[in-house]
């Protein structure tokens, strides 16, 4: 193992109790999208990035490269689960829970930031690491607003990870999510008496849906 990797791993091991505490607490809190108030407090005392109460950005270092590490920590409704169980066992009937390990995703991102911070401190190399708290991921919410406000423009790279059934490095990019709201308007008319005067908003919705389906195949 290289010295650089060892520096980072030693720092992570030193803080492992804190990292595990964060993972366990986020699991227990199981807060829904954009309601992760206690979960966000585990990371940072100052939230409110981009006007989102449970989003945050915490940086260390100076100069380039500037690496962003993305943490997520929201839960899903109806997925309450006792920890340490291999079968579904609700902790709270009908309660919230983590469907794909976002408690680990957030804690693992924190561990990565701790490792990079330690490397920057001990080597004196130029560079900046920023840990971004990205709430509401299950609904595709916060990152869209963070992109809108230009939060990523300062970065040379943004990295994240996700719990899986194997360990691997995925070098490809992720698809962007842009939220858009469309409103369709029609013109009311009697279907039998004067159908030619009507304009169906539903027809427009169906045509757009078909067009998007064909477009997606070629993107």
Model-derived segments and spans:
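Histidine/acidic-residue-rich, glycine-tolerant segments that coordinate divalent metal ions
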Residues: 56, 76-78, 84-97, 103-104, ...
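Acidic/His- and Gly-rich active-site-bordering loop/insert found
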Residues: 4-98, 103, 107-127
